[in-house]
């Protein structure tokens, strides 16, 4: 899921995460967990770089919203530390041989925060909200293969044929065609269960006063300041250790400010700016956790914006940017250099690809083919960023300098209000923009389908290739895993040939924690999906 330049934002058993080491300095959470008995109590103060746009799962479209929603709600399934799909409210499930019928058997006694029990009807309602066009959910495309999807969206029916409460604790989902990413997609933030009576009573206010089933309950929100959650004593997996979570909103402030407050012990965790990495990791009592995550930060090239509808110009931009120098010299190698769309560790990843190595001569050649030799006749390009951090500004200035060498002049703009920035992307008003996508679920479709299918609401670059659309639809229906992965590799190659983006980096989850923080578990989906129900605070002596 999405976003930032620091911006943004969002595997079953076959994900080979063993190739990715988890680095933990000073101490090991795993070792500590085995030696010490968790204790209850305390408030965990967690920073958010921007204000979440919503706390309603169906409307979520950024990592800041996900970070909070994940603590408030549950779905049918969830991901473990290795991204296997495991039970949540559904204790078990079965899938028909033809891939068209999914049957989920729910736990009894799971309660919403208003103390009403969850039933299969609640999932029918919650999933129907995703499809409802009034909600404009970015997850609606994941349910296109559900029987009755189009009829419900077009207002021809009052219910979705493919969602059925067979019994009080049995839910059935019927598809018109196979969609094999579905079971993994059901673990994403949008497929959480909500109580119909509370949504209808609160209306749009539900997004600011949510009621879920999760380990923490909503308490209060101060716009651009903080969001407070409290432990749910009736949680079906048991009461969490923490009494409260206080999300502190920094509203686009530099990460240096967040780290400063952390050092003053006003926060339990912090991001680590590149220039601070050495000091924080070495010789300090803090706990530093690092792990690669399924993500991609890129420059989007909006094909609706002239002259970026010119494929050769887009290729020139790709060849002109020295990504390796930017990662090493500006970001101190805090990121992995990206060579494509799918990140390392994602099924379908091809380690051998590198379609656009830095090559100024080839960039100049494509400028000529585009009709703009040495930039002649080319107007300035506008680049937009939601981050105004020191590192972001350095990178953007370097990008501007590199592009100027082949005759492309750039004007840099900042919009640090995330909802405004996202709204600009949705309306295709940013010709070039920096953006990051964090996986919502561990499947290639979560990158290739969500970002590049012409019908996807997250296709902010207005990319449209009918053959790519056709192959994406075909891959989603392919039961054979190896064939499916081969199809996604072909799709990625086709997209990269069209050059609608400039892939830059794959993120590393890098956070520093106070030495008394215990029980942190991070999977390759990164920080927003950390189960805070497992965190506890060792009492300070």
Roles of regions detected by a PLM:
Residues 91-142, 172, 261, 307:
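Aromatic- and charge-enriched surface segment that lines or borders ligand/interaction sites
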Residues 122, 131, 138-195:
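Surface-exposed binding/hinge segments that line
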Residues 511-541:
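Long beta-strand-rich cores associated with HINT superfamily self-processing modules
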Residues 223, 368-439, 481, 509:
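Ligand/substrate-recognition segments at binding pockets and active sites
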Residues 207, 234-280, 409:
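Ligand-site clamp/hinge motif
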Residues 31, 37, 327, 409-426, ...:
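Extracytoplasmic/peripheral linker and loop segments enriched in polar/acidic and small residues
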Residues 47-97, 128, 209-211:
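N-terminal lobe/hinge region of extracytoplasmic solute-binding protein
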Residues 231, 309-401, 405, 464, ...:
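Append "and occasionally in soluble cytosolic enzymes with long acidic Gly/Pro-rich linkers
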């Amino acid at each position: 899921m999405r976003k930032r330049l620091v911006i943004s934002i969002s595997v079953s058993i076959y994900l080979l995460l063993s190739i990715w080491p988890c680095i933990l300095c000073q101490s090991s959470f795993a070792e500590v967990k085995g030696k010490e008995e968790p204790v209850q109590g305390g408030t965990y103060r967690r920073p958010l770089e921007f204000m979440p746009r919503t706390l309603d799962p169906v409307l979520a479209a950024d990592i800041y919203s996900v970070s909070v929603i994940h603590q408030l709600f549950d779905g049918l399934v969830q991901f473990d530390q290795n991204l296997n799909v495991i039970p949540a409210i559904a204790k078990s499930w079965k899938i028909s041989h033809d891939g068209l019928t999914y049957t989920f058997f729910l736990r009894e006694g799971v309660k919403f925060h208003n103390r009403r029990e969850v039933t299969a009807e609640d999932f029918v309602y919650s999933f129907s909200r995703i499809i409802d066009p009034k909600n404009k959910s970015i997850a609606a495309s994941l349910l296109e293969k559900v029987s009755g999807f189009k009829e419900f969206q077009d207002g021809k029916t009052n219910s979705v044929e493919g969602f059925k409460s067979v019994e009080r604790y049995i839910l059935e989902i019927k598809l018109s065609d196979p969609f094999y990413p579905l079971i993994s997609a059901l673990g994403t933030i949008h497929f959480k269960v909500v109580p119909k009576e509370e949504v209808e009573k609160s209306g749009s206010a539900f997004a600011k006063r949510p009621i879920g089933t999760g380990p923490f309950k909503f308490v209060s929100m101060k716009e651009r300041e903080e969001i407070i959650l409290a432990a749910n004593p009736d949680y079906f997996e048991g009461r969490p250790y923490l009494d409260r979570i206080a999300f502190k909103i920094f509203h686009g402030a530099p990460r240096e400010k967040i780290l400063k407050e952390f050092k003053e012990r006003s926060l339990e965790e912090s991001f680590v700016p590149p220039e601070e990495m050495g000091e924080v990791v070495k010789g300090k009592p803090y706990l530093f956790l690092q792990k690669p995550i399924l993500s991609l930060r890129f420059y989007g090239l909006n094909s609706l914006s002239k002259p970026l509808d010119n494929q050769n110009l887009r290729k020139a931009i790709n060849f002109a940017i020295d990504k390796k120098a930017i990662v090493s010299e500006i970001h101190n190698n805090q990121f992995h250099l990206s060579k494509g769309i799918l990140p390392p560790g994602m099924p379908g990843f091809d380690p051998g690809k590198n379609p656009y190595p830095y090559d100024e001569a080839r960039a100049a050649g494509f400028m000529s083919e585009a009709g703009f030799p040495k930039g002649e006749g080319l107007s300035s390009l506008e680049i937009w960023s939601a981050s105004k951090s020191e590192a972001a500004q350095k990178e953007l200035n370097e990008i501007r300098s590199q592009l100027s060498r082949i005759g492309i002049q750039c004007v840099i703009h900042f919009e640090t209000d995330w909802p405004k920035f996202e709204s600009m992307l949705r309306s295709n008003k940013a010709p070039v923009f920096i953006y990051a996508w964090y996986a919502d679920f561990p499947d290639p479709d979560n990158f290739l389908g969500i970002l590049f299918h012409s019908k996807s609401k997250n296709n902010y670059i207005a990319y449209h290739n009918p053959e790519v659309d056709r192959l994406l639809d075909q891959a989603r229906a392919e039961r054979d895993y190896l064939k499916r992965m081969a199809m996604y590799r072909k799709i990625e190659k086709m997209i990269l040939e069209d050059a609608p983006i400039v892939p830059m980096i794959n993120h590393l989850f890098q956070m520093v924690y106070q030495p008394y923080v215990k029980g942190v578990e991070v999977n390759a989906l990164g920080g927003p999906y950390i189960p805070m129900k497992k965190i506890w605070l060792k009492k300070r002596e």
